[in-house]
């Protein structure tokens, strides 16, 4: 059922998109209560990890995305899952708030001017699956081609902009090698 959304990319603001994004409806997200938009194109991308459980199949990643959203909405009282996108080790990108809604991933200074991409899992002591890294890089490339990200966008690690261990030592080392990474 993962491909059932393919005829409806316009519903995600992804008409003629090069991105493979699992829509909220596919992972059975709760309705968002967020409405504050992001000014496009966005200059910054903040990479984090959830520091929670890993997922490696569409079913387990959909469940993990729901778990993250439930915690952030019900326990923390946020209007939705904090991130614009979530990356699973199944190699899929899961729509959080998407390209157009401000996230709650990095605090009041960075949220209004960045896209938050989180890798589901804890990457302190292990690297993400290659297919997860490819999915994230493809999402960034598509963000530029679709006009959501500036062509000269900058990638930051969560720890570069906030006092945290996120995105974990192993993932942080990897993103530092990405072309758009800036400390």
From Swiss-Prot:
Expressed in all regions of the brain. One of its GO terms (biological process) is immune response. Residues 40-168 form the N-acetylmuramoyl-L-alanine amidase domain. SUPFAM superfamilies: N-acetylmuramoyl-L-alanine amidase-like (SSF55846). InterPro entries: Amidase/PGRP_sf, Amidase_domain, Peptidoglycan_recognition, PGRP, PGRP_domain_met/bac. GO terms for cellular component: extracellular space. Innate immunity protein that plays several important functions in antimicrobial and antitumor defense systems. Acts as a pattern receptor that binds to murein peptidoglycans (PGN) of Gram-positive bacteria and thus provides bactericidal activity. Forms an equimolar complex with heat shock protein HSPA1A and induces programmed cell death through apoptosis and necroptosis in tumor cell lines by activating the TNFR1 receptor on the target cell membrane. In addition, acts in complex with the Ca(2+)-binding protein S100A4 as a chemoattractant able to induce lymphocyte movement. PANTHER family: PEPTIDOGLYCAN RECOGNITION PROTEIN, PEPTIDOGLYCAN RECOGNITION PROTEIN 1. This is Peptidoglycan recognition protein 1.
């Amino acid at each position: 059922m993962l491909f059932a959304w393919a005829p409806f990319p316009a519903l995600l603001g992804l008409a003629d998109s090069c991105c493979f994004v699992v829509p909220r409806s596919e992972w059975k997200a709760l309705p968002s209560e967020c409405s504050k938009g992001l000014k496009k194109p966005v200059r910054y991308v903040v990479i984090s990890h959830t520091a929670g459980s890993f997922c490696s199949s569409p079913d387990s990643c959909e469940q993990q995305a729901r778990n993250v959203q439930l915690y952030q909405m019900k326990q923390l009282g946020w209007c939705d899952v904090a991130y614009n996108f979530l990356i699973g080790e199944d190699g899929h990108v899961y729509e959080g708030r998407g390209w157009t809604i401000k996230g709650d991933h990095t605090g009041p200074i960075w949220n209004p001017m960045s896209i938050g991409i989180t890798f589901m899992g804890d990457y302190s002591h292990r690297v993400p699956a290659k297919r997860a890294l490819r999915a994230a890089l493809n999402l960034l490339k598509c963000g530029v081609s679709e006009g959501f990200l500036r062509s000269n966008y900058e990638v930051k690690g969560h720890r570069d902009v906030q006092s945290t261990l996120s995105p974990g030592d192993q993932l942080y080392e990897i993103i530092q090698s990405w072309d758009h990474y800036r400390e």
